[in-house]
Amino acid sequence: MSLFGTTSGFGTGGTSMFGSTTTDNHNPMKDIEVTSSPDDSIGCLSFSPPTLPGNFLIAGSWANDVRCWEVQDSGQTIPKAQQMHTGPVLDVCWSDDGSKVFTASCDKTAKMWDLNSNQAIQIAQHDAPVKTIHWIKAPNYSCVMTGSWDKTLKFWDTRSSNPMMVLQLPERCYCADVIYPMAVVATAERGLIVYQLENQPSEFRRIESPLKHQHRCVAIFKDKQNKPTGFALGSIEGRVAIHYINPPNPAKDNFTFKCHRSNGTNTSAPQDIYAVNGIAFHPVHGTLATVGSDGRFSFWDKDARTKLKTSEQLDQPVAACGFNHNGNIFAYASSYDWSKGHEFYNPQKKNYIFLRNAAEELKPRNKK
């Protein structure tokens, strides 16, 4: 059966090509607008794995829905299918073969969405909202890892209603990432734990947070041999930490940098400081993107410790981001991120997902 079977798309929005969008402050970078974007804040984005031909994009939103688009080479986006939770969708991920999508929600459940049949079934249950979800593909097991505000990390065989394993967290799970054989989980009260996933998941190390404020997002990075070797951690205080697991020189190799602040990083002038909402590493170059509540995205070279690019300011926060499997497309979501609370939420404000050609802008800075 073909991917998505015979499911119909959603919405009736038009499509646009690379470089043909209008120039206003909702899209100052003139990037491609994804058609039929969600009707409420977009919390998460994820592109399909390289095992699938073509590119498919998943987004979860505070309208309780999960949407899937096909992204064509021209930049045109085609709505393919949609599923619902009974609460906001906080995280999404793909199975390694691209046949399933996993979704985590405030309704305290996680679901598995079979894209061939367009059927979704519950695969996980927590006692509080499920904040993170990741697929783990090990040589001897496959499972889904869910992190929750109930202070647990659970591992699920999708064929069973009971977890394979439950690990207690020191606090509520705020963000997580997985690249086998490594997982990292950041919690409330600045908790930070690295797990090793070989044979079976187990705690590897607790790390004193390099950041002084609440953790917001985390992404694992790889070395030149394509092995996970460290992570980038973002906070609500406009700062990112680059942390290696086993660096030759910790004091020199680990560092933090300021980002998503007004007036650049000139500390002599008063600054508005914004949350870092998302971090994504380029799958080819190893450079990274950050997105923030200031309504900008930035590209960075962590090895050269330099900024490659900062976008113009959008008229609302950039809430999530991600690269496709070969790094040619950068997706970012423009919508309210709740960083200023409910009183600043405007339900009339449209939400957008934009696609940008990322092939050139993420190339690392030449070494002198």
From Swiss-Prot:
GO biological process: cell division; regulation of mitotic spindle organization; RNA export from nucleus; transcription-dependent tethering of RNA polymerase II gene DNA at nuclear periphery
Modified positions (Phosphothreonine) in chain numbering: 229
Cellular localisation: Cytoplasm; Nucleus; Cytoplasm, Cytoskeleton, Spindle pole
Region spans: Disordered: 15-34
GO cellular component, one term: fibrillar center
Protein name: mRNA export factor
Self-association state and partner proteins as the record states: Interacts with NUMA1 (via N-terminal end of the coiled-coil domain); this interaction promotes spindle formation in mitosis. Interacts with NUP98. Interacts with MYCBP2. Interacts with USP11.
Described function: Plays a role in mitotic bipolar spindle formation. Binds mRNA. May function in nucleocytoplasmic transport and in directly or indirectly attaching cytoplasmic mRNPs to the cytoskeleton.
Family affiliation: Belongs to the WD repeat rae1 family.
Residue spans of the WD repeats: 37-79, 84-114, 125-157, 168-206, 215-255, 271-301, 310-346
A GO MF label: ubiquitin binding
Classification via InterPro entries: G-protein_beta_WD-40_rep, WD40/YVTN_repeat-like_dom_sf, WD40_repeat_CS, WD40_repeat_dom_sf, WD40_rpt
Organism: Rattus norvegicus
Alphabetically ordered keywords of this record: Cell cycle, Cell division, Cytoplasm, Cytoskeleton, Mitosis, Nucleus, Phosphoprotein, Repeat, Transport, WD repeat
Primary localisation category: cytoplasm
Underlying gene: Rae1
